[in-house]
From Swiss-Prot:
Keywords: ATP-binding, Chaperone, Cytoplasm, Nucleotide-binding, Stress response. The keyword Heme does not apply. Residues 601-620 are annotated as: Disordered. The gene is htpG. The keyword rRNA-binding does not apply. PROSITE patterns: HSP90 (PS00298). Belongs to the heat shock protein 90 family. Residues 327-545 are annotated as: B. GO terms for cellular component: cytoplasm. This is Chaperone protein HtpG. InterPro entries: HATPase_C_sf, Heat_shock_protein_90_CS, HSP90_C, Hsp90_fam, Hsp90_N, Ribosomal_Su5_D2-typ_SF. GO terms for molecular function: ATP binding; ATP hydrolysis activity; ATP-dependent protein folding chaperone; unfolded protein binding.
Amino acid sequence: MQKGNIGVTTENIFPIIKKFLYSDHEIFLRELVSNAVDATQKLNTLASISEFKGELGDLTVHVSLGKDTITISDRGIGLTAEEIDKYINQIAFSGANDFLEKYKNDANAIIGHFGLGFYSAFMVSKKVEIITKSYKEGAQAVKWTCDGSPEFTLEEVEKADRGTDIVLYIDDDCKEFLEESRISALLKKYCSFLPVPIAFGKKKEWKDGKQVETAEDNVINDTIPLWTKKPSELSDEDYKKFYRELYPMSDEPLFWIHLNVDYPFHLTGILYFPKVKSNIDLNKNKIQLYCNQVYVTDSVEGIVPDFLTLLHGVLDSPDIPLNVSRSYLQSDSNVKKISTYISKKVSDRLQSIFKNDRAQFEEKWNDLKIFINYGMLTQEDFYDKAQKFALFTDTDGKHYTFEEYQTLIKDNQTDKDKNLIYLYANNKDEQFAYIEAAKNKGYNVLLMDGQLDVAMVSMLEQKLEKSRFTRVDSDVVDNLIVKEDKKSDVLEASKQEALSAAFKSQLPKMEKVEFNVMTQALGENGSPVMITQSEYMRRMKEMANIQAGMSFYGEMPDMFNLVLNSDHKLVKEVLADEEKECSAAIAPIQTELEDVTKRRDALKKKQEGKKDEDIPTAEKDELNDLDKKWDELKQQKDSIFAGYAGKNKVVRQLIDLALLQNNMLKGEALNNFVKRSIELI
């Protein structure tokens, strides 16, 4: 029996492994099974070039559980005593401390950097045994034993067959790994597609009302997964079946892209466009990354363009440096090439479907839209390609490319400044009246109700030349596309003031909502009262909800305009009745107000250009008194108008109709509206 110390050139490796890799200690199974697969594949390679002439036999790798042990067994090339000394005992571990400090939270980086796959066994074991026999003719089987200290023993033993058994004596604080369900789950996670059969226990069948083991190995992996096959050999059903195996709870995918490239890097895989039902489905950890069919991670940021991390599927590449920091990964030239390649393949596939089967593309547009819009917003190269197949959808459900839509609206939706005006709605039901008003003017209205459409509108205004997007409820229909300079409202100022004061007094109090009342001549057939919302302010608030650094807008109240149509019969009747009821009370106040206004304006003109210290105190006091008097008289007038409006049910009825049209009338206010409607009828 040989005894000795492991050749570690710095501190003892085992406490380091346990300390720094504990958070990821489940990867020990991946590392040990992968090593067994490597040993098996090496034997296959030697046999193929006639350097091994013996029988290959069953090459299945077996994982088995004992009372306190896990054993991983293979029939690969095995090891001689000299090879154990070279590959197990002599660990090139110089500079370890600096590296461990840098990557102390990344088990993959430490294990992969030093080739320490085997030593991951000590993360969960108090003792490890290697019982191995080389494939070489006349080789002597040996047993290596280590209890987690730098000391080991190596002795000759009897072993009938070539290959290696690694026996882990599990630590007391890692007993979870002796549970069949735990090991089964880890094998499924890490080893489902390894290229050599992996057996864990025996298959079970129901017999006499209970499950019993059969003599057949329970092979847990698919050795030739779909992505390793040629696309020409596969049917649509093959791709769908594989998707169901990967994501059993998901709906059928929209379509898929089979990746297969050998130069200038190696990459295979299948990416699926999933059917997204809601924000909940937007999970970025659904692409599985493999290295030579060994599962590595489902965190592919930096490898896959950000907008494509929403996709599902698998990627397999030996050229992606898997065990390094994220910052290094993002600067790696191969990774950049792979990311660019994947983006190009996706855009080419989308372009192909659009060109060859536009009907199918349009049918799936609502599901594809989230991916395509995300890509256009985040990647310039993708925008340049996607603008040829990205679609607008109007409120009638018709689809247009950007170029097609510009052609459609340029004659009727160009304003006086030669801007192309894209009218849109984000809720067909709530904005129905506004949509219909626009369509009656011959305008087309887009439906932009997607999760990213707020951001898309802002981006497209920058990308599309002389183009502006305006929501249909942002103004009255005649002002949505201003084709010539408008004449000012013909209603005189005193009448506008009377109407505005009356209606403003009856507006409901709403939390974080403010109204501005105005009058406009909108024609006899226009609505008597409408509610609009400034495009700019509304858009700023919407952007504040999705973009950091704009919280100022998010905290501001919603600003709405209550627009009174001075041409409408009902508004005219309210005005005439208001003048009749209020004129006697208003007249003396108005006379006094005009006198105050005249004197105040004269004083202000007199003080123009003077420094404050040059204005007599008496004049300052008089102006201050006049300001207070003016406010007082204005309040008296408004109070009279408010008193009238409170008695005229038509005023509140018209306001409530406008609120109802905008889905802003609820609860008690809605109940009062219904009662009032019955009374008025």
